[in-house]
UniProtKB/Swiss-Prot annotation:
One Gene Ontology CC term in the entry: cytoplasm
SUPFAM superfamilies documented for this protein: Ribulose-phoshate binding barrel
Organism: Albidiferax ferrireducens (strain ATCC BAA-621 / DSM 15236 / T118) (Rhodoferax ferrireducens)
Gene3D superfamilies per record: Aldolase class I
Function, in words: IGPS catalyzes the conversion of PRFAR and glutamine to IGP, AICAR and glutamate. The HisF subunit catalyzes the cyclization activity that produces IGP and AICAR from PRFAR using the ammonia provided by the HisH subunit.
Keyword Kinase: no
Presence of the UniProt keyword Amino-acid biosynthesis in the record: yes
InterPro entries associated with the record: Aldolase_TIM (IPR013785), His_biosynth (IPR006062), HisF (IPR004651), IGPS_HisA/HisF (IPR050064), RibuloseP-bd_barrel (IPR011060)
Compartments it resides in: Cytoplasm
UniProt protein name: Imidazole glycerol phosphate synthase subunit HisF
CDD domains: HisF
Length: 266
């Protein structure tokens, strides 16, 4: 069985790592280069770096920060936020990224996933999906294809600001079919709450696609990480708050997961 991965996440805006609750109420967590180096030393399996306001602000890629982070990190680095084109993938890979994450751009132009995957390989193309559970009042409305929707989760774009009307499970399946090598799945309802992953969402998407799924949004305890794997069916778990503010180390997280019978790289 393949080892399951623990991935600290650096949400960055204004050149600083931040963390919020439900995608708002951001507070400062430190310098991205220093934090990345710390996680590298702690034994993280990978790092994910997301410029969370690049798309909504219409900004270009912050390549100078990516280069600085990549110089300190010797584990796979995924970079997202403001990734719009196949050429952006080239620029990020040249800056030191190992994988690039598309979100809003894939919604605007799904073909970019196929094009990027064909040019650079599915192994370095991640599609990030920000999903939010539908309210009872949403059930029965028409989706983007004119079909009445049932219970489930909608996909949001532009840093969680815009409801696309797309169903998260169907969207994940389409992205995998077009060439995404991995799905980074974030529950907006759970983000920053420390209440645990939305395990129903994680399981629904994990069951729907054949590519690895990274569970994100809501980790507050080490058991939450293990639950994402064992109950949610995720291949990797991503967390921010519990690591950024020193509640737990990556090593503690791995030891706990190993004790729960989950294969990890120690």
């Amino acid at each position: 069985m393949l080892a399951k991965r623990i991935i600290p996440c650096l949400d960055v805006t204004g050149g600083r790592v931040v963390k919020g609750v439900n995608f708002v109420e951001l507070r400062d967590a430190g310098d991205p280069v220093e934090i990345a180096a710390r996680y590298n030393d702690q034994g993280a399996d990978e790092l994910t770096f997301l410029d969370i306001t690049a798309t909504s602000d219409g900004r270009d890629l912050i390549l100078h920060i990516i280069e600085a982070v990549a110089s300190q990190v010797f584990i796979p680095l995924t970079v997202g936020g403001g990734v719009r084109t196949v050429d952006d993938v080239r620029r990020l890979l040249n800056a030191g990224a190992d994988k690039t994450s598309f979100n809003s751009a894939a919604i605007a132009n799904p073909q970019v996933i196929r094009d990027a995957s064909r040019k650079y390989g599915a192994q370095c193309i991640v599609v990030a999906i920000d999903a939010k559970r539908r309210l009872a009042t949403d059930v029965g409305r028409l989706d983007a294809n004119g079909q009445a929707v049932g219970e489930g989760w909608d996909v949001y774009s532009h840093g969680g600001r815009k409801n696309t009307g797309l169903d998260a499970v169907i969207w994940a399946r389409l992205m995998a079919e077009l060439g995404a090598g991995e799905i980074l799945l974030t529950s907006m309802d759970r983000d920053g709450t420390k209440a645990g992953f939305d395990l129903a969402l994680t399981r629904a998407v994990s069951d729907a696609v054949s590519v690895p799924v990274i569970a994100s949004g809501g980790v507050g305890t080490l058991d939450h990480l293990a639950d994402g794997i064992q109950i949610g069916g995720a291949d990797a778990v991503l967390a921010a708050s519990i690591f950024h503010y020193g509640e737990f180390t990556v090593a503690q997280a791995k030891a706990h997961m190993a004790a729960r019978g989950i294969p990890v790289r120690i």
